[in-house]
């Protein structure tokens, strides 16, 4: 059986752990596919489970990324990004809480004390 001359291809990966974001993985797969089959029509749709990379996935489709300095889970200032979408009926903010209070912000790893200190309040006040 031979493949049709032109395929419609959907590329929709999530991130590859800490190695590639969903957006970067989508682009890498699309480049490889296009190199092998340049006449195919590719639709790119990076995915996210709502954790790290969520804002990047949405930003690949719509909205404006805004960077703010907020209090992290241990009280130190950290940089966090959120997506501002004004294209719908009402302006909408998409917040990736892991940027401000994710485990990576705890340094040496969570302990019962530091894990309870995680707070999303500073992101909500933006």
Predicted regions and their residues:
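Short, contiguous strand/loop micro-motifs
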Residues: 16-17, 41, 111
